[in-house]
Structure formats: C-alpha cells, structure tokens
Amino acid sequence: QTSLDGLYAAGETGCTGLHGANRLASNSLLECVVVAKRALDSMLSLQPLRKDAPTSYDIPAWHHGDTALPDELSVIYHNWDEIRRLMWDYVSIVRTNKRLDRAATRLRMLHREVKDFYWGYRITPDILELRNLVAVASLIVDCAMRRNESRGLHFNTDYPGKLDHRFVTQLHRW
C-alpha cells in the first residue's frame, strides 16, 4: 500500500524486492501474484463490500441506433498509421519541445476526428483501437512535455541533464 489510503502499487513502481525468475526486483510474475493477493486481502479487511457502490463511471452508454458502418475505413487506417509515424518521428528516444508540441497539436486533431467516428458510426474494433491509440499517444506526449530533464531513454535536447535532487531513490547494498 502506498502513502495514499487505498492506493496500491505493484511492478517496478512498487519497489518490493521480489525477484521471481527475473534478475530485476519488482518486475516479475511472482510480484503480480503475491502483491495482488496481498492487496486484495488488505482491501477486503478494511471495510465490507458496499452494495451501493457505483458500477459505472459516468461513461455515457453508446447506442448505435441507425448508424452505419464507416464508409471511409481507409481514413481510419490512415489515422492509425499516422499515429505510428507521428510517435516515431516526434516522440521517439531523442525529443525536442518543438517536436513534442507538434505531436500534441496533431493528436488533438486526430482526437476530434476519432470522436466523430466513435459517435457517428457503428463501433468496430478498428475504431476502438484507434481511439485507444490516440488516448495513449496523447498521454505519452503530455508526460514527455511535462518532463524537464533527460533520464534513461527519455532524452530531450532542450533538457539534456538529470534533476536527481527531485527524485527519492532506494539504494540496496548486497
């Protein structure tokens, strides 16, 4: 459990020290099983399950009504490919603020186009995947734009140094 009540962390962010079959701690299937079970047990012990707990999160139900399948499937595939190229060209390992800004601008336009497909046509797996690609790409670009340092494979030529003083690290001695 993290310092926030009810929030649990697993995987690399958990820093549990469990190794499993991996050489890196907190990056194994063992952690998935053990930490998930411990988190479940902890949550169940905190309070009984509420029968009035919300089952939806204000996501409007989609009703296809008289909508048709998209007549411009090639546009969906073009947008799909554009996201891949955009992320490779502007948001790959070596980044600049200008390229990140260009990527964010284009992703906003793609988001509007995908929204039109999502609400105007019958949903297909390709539309859902395109919507998810735009969402994940937008999150990656947003996080990259907020980072004002270079760390690991996140190198921004506008911020070539590390800001180690901003990070609390755990050191283990063997």
Short names for language-model regions:
Residues 1-9, 13-174:
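Glycine- and aromatic-enriched mobile tails/lids
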